[in-house]
A protein has these predicted regions:
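A solvent-exposed, acidic/Ser-Thr-rich amphipathic alpha-helical stretch
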Residues: 21-22, 28-72
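Short helix-capping and inter-helix turn/linker motifs at the boundaries of alpha-helical repeat units
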Residues: 1-2
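Short acidic-aromatic low-complexity motifs
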Residues: 5-26
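Residue-level detection of beta-strand scaffold positions
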Residues: 10-11, 22, 31, 76, ...
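A beta-strand edge to alpha-helix "cap/lid" segment located at domain peripheries
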Residues: 52-136
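Short, contiguous strand/loop micro-motifs
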Residues: 6-7, 38, 97
Length: 136
């Protein structure tokens, strides 16, 4: 069984690669997935339905800057990128995960909506002036 940090990093990298089988295997059936300020998603099946529905329509990239664990809890600071066709939205995220029996039971992300707004504006400008596109 992997340590909790490795489980979380394997999961995020699998999402980036659209390896949904690996991503699903990292999640517990009773997953709680929350982007703070948005509706909470309960259950692995619902979360995976969301991720799979974006295949071919949106992309996800991740750069993990640092991770720390205390028992089952994993905290990470990372940069996430969401792509929608030529639109690239890159922003900072702090993630909180809980891993039990090798599977993620909690995934809670914190981010600043102003940063998302600025990233969206930069992404829109980058569609017109490619040198303005954010890069990981």
């Amino acid at each position: 069984m992997q340590n909790p940090i490795a489980t979380v990093e394997t999961f995020l990298n699998a999402l980036q690669e659209q390896d949904f089988d690996t991503a699903e295997n990292a999640l517990a059936q009773n997953l709680v997935y929350q982007n703070v300020g948005m509706p909470t998603i309960y259950g692995r099946n619902r979360a995976m339905k969301l991720f799979r529905s974006m295949q071919g329509r949106a992309g996800f990239e991740v750069k993990i800057h640092r991770s720390a664990a205390d028992g089952a809890a994993v905290l990470n600071e990372r940069t996430d990128v969401l792509t929608f066709g030529p639109l690239r939205v890159q922003f900072w995220v702090c993630g909180v995960f809980e891993v039990h029996d090798g599977r993620i039971t909690l995934w809670r992300d914190y981010f600043d909506y102003l940063d998302i707004f600025k990233a969206t504006v930069r992404g829109l400008l980058g569609m017109v002036v490619p040198s303005l596109r954010a890069k990981l």
